[in-house]
C-alpha cells in the first residue's frame, strides 16, 4: 500500500521515506500508538485492512504553532477499513528446521495482536528466531523526528564482518523481542500512551584469516 503512493519509498529496514526524507510522524486513524516504532504495525497489519494512506506535508506537530511557523515535517496517516477498525487482528507464525552445518535446531516464531480504532489502540508483539533474521529494528524509532530517543551504550562493541553476503548469512543469533503499546485518545488535546519493550539478543561470531604467499621458482 505504501509503495504505491507517489514519492514514497520503503527501505530494507522498513523505514518509510517521502521524496528521500524519512517521515517525521506515523499515524493510524490520527494516533501514534507505537511512538515512531511503526515496524510493529507495518510488519503485522494486512494491506486489506487499510482503506487509504495520506501524506501530509508541512505538518506542524506543535498545536500552538499551527498557522504561525512553517514546518518541513512530513506525516503519514493510515485510515482503516471500517470492518477492521476497533477489531482485534491476530497473527501467528512458526517454523523449524535443522542445520547440518551446525548440528542444531533452527526456529522462527511470532505472535502479534493489534486493535486499532479512533479512540483507543493496542499493539502487542513477540518474535523469536535463531536463523539469522535481524529483529533489532522492532524496537527502533524510525521516524525522522526522533530527538526523544537516547542511544544506549553497550559494555562491549562487536566488530563487524565485511563480506559479499546477505546479512542473514553472517548473523548467528538467538533473539527474543517483546513489546506492548496501548494508547487512549479522548480529544485533540488529551491522550495517554503506555509502552514497554524488551529484547534479549545473543550473537556469536567467529573470524578467520588465511594468507597464501607464492614465491617464484
Where are these regions (language model features)?
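Membrane-proximal, glycine/serine-rich, low-complexity loop/turn segments characteristic
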Residues: 1-217
Amino acid at each position: 500500500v505504501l509503495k504505491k503512493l507517489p514519492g514514497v519509498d520503503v527501505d530494507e529496514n522498513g523505514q518509510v521515506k517521502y521524496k528521500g526524507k524519512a517521515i517525521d510522524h506515523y499515524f493510524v486513524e490520527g494516533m501514534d500508538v507505537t511512538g515512531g516504532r511503526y515496524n510493529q504495525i507495518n510488519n503485522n497489519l494486512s494491506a486489506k485492512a487499510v482503506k487509504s494512506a495520506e501524506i501530509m506535508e508541512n505538518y506542524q506537530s506543535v498545536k500552538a504553532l499551527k498557522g504561525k511557523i512553517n514546518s518541513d515535517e512530513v506525516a503519514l496517516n493510515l485510515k482503516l477499513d471500517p470492518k477492521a477498525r476497533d477489531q482485534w487482528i491476530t497473527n501467528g507464525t512458526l517454523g523449524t528446521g535443522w542445520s547440518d552445518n551446525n548440528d542444531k535446531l533452527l526456529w522462527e516464531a511470532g505472535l502479534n495482536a493489534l486493535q486499532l480504532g479512533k479512540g483507543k489502540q493496542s499493539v502487542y508483539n513477540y518474535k523469536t528466531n535463531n536463523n539469522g533474521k535481524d529483529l533489532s529494528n522492532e524496537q527502533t524509532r524510525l521516524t525522522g523526528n526522533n530527538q526523544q530517543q537516547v542511544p544506549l551504550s553497550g559494555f562491549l562493541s562487536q566488530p563487524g564482518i565485511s563480506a559479499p553476503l546477505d546479512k542473514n548469512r553472517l548473523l548467528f543469533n538467538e533473539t527474543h523481542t517483546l513489546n506492548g503499546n496501548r494508547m487512549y485518545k479522548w480529544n485533540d488535546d488529551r491522550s495517554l500512551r503506555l509502552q514497554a519493550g524488551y529484547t534479549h539478543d545473543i550473537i556469536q561470531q567467529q573470524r578467520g584469516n588465511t594468507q597464501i604467499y607464492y614465491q617464484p621458482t
